[in-house]
Amino acid sequence: MTRSIAKFILIAMCGFVAASAPAFAADKVTMSSTNITAFDLDQIVALSKGFFAKENIEFEPTYMQPDLVIKALLAGTVDLAKSGTHFGMIAATRGGELKVIGGSTYGYAYQIIGQPQFKALADLKGQKIAGAGVASITTTIFKDVMQRQGIPPSAYTILSIGGSAERFQAVASGQVAASLAEAPPYNFRSIDSGKRVLLNYSDEIKSIQYGSYFASNKSLAQMRPVLVRFMRAIGQSMRWLNDPVNEKEAVRIMMDRLKIDETIAARTFKFMVPENHSFRGEGLVDPVGLNEMIRLLAMDNLIPERKPWETFVDAGFLPVAAK
């Protein structure tokens, strides 16, 4: 066998082995979250645009009731949780072993919607307001904003009606004067039926990390590099969302994933992204926004004391400027 033939055979064998070798399996990341809505555009886009795939991540979400999301994480049934920041912070103050590793939504993209005869928040004195529960963060934020207007909790009555759909229906039926918090699509339905926007919360609340990604101490110990890649994909997704050139494609993605028509999708995108800048933080921890959440929770006695925001965050996921 000549040297040239032997070399050819060796190269061919190497090529065969390379072609036969399996690709590196993607790292599976399991996550608990509430039912998917416009507040989940970051993960929707990360899936649809391949940002998770680019980071070699197989994303597996499990949807459940809001109060179960953090419980699933602490029980060890998922790797991380996407939750209202308040749920995770409350759990942490009660001994839960979990940390914030990033932001999911920034600001508070809700509106106070009232009957058409009411023109300002002051008009709600003596009225019944549709709320979630006494310990709900939506109730806490509403009371704080009303207090800023000089309207104490004793001046109105909050009824524990339920979630956005139930609050919307309570306003539509005339059962209450207003809903303390509505977001797409229910705010649009109320407005289209002649109800009045009494407050865009973003006019009062400039900075709050409303939603967060949480990891358990166990997950952080066992799969930190994977979680870093996960948050990098989320950051890429938010940057993509915030680029105006992608608006039309984002609307199409929303239509497909949220099962809504083009008009609602376009209005929702405008409300969530350019108007409320809900994904402006690009997945990073927002110290100012966390401090505001801590202030609200302590004010309403949902946590026992006002601890430093660093207490709730894994230091490895802090933005460089905050370290």
Regions found by a protein language model. Name each.
Residues 221-302:
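Secondary-structure end/capping motifs
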Residues 87, 165-258:
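Pocket-lining segment of extracytoplasmic ligand-binding domains
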Residues 1-7:
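Positively charged n-region of N-terminal signal peptides that target proteins for export
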Residues 22-24:
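Signal peptide processing junction and immediate N-terminal pro/mature segment
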Residues 291-323:
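Conserved C-terminal helix/tail region of periplasmic/extracytoplasmic solute-binding proteins
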Residues 8-20:
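Bacterial N-terminal signal peptides
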Residues 78-83, 172-173, 271-287, 319-323:
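Short amphipathic alpha-helical segments at helix boundaries and their inter-helical linkers
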Residues 26-163, 167-173, 177-184, 197-207:
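Short, glycine-/small- and polar/acidic-enriched structural segments
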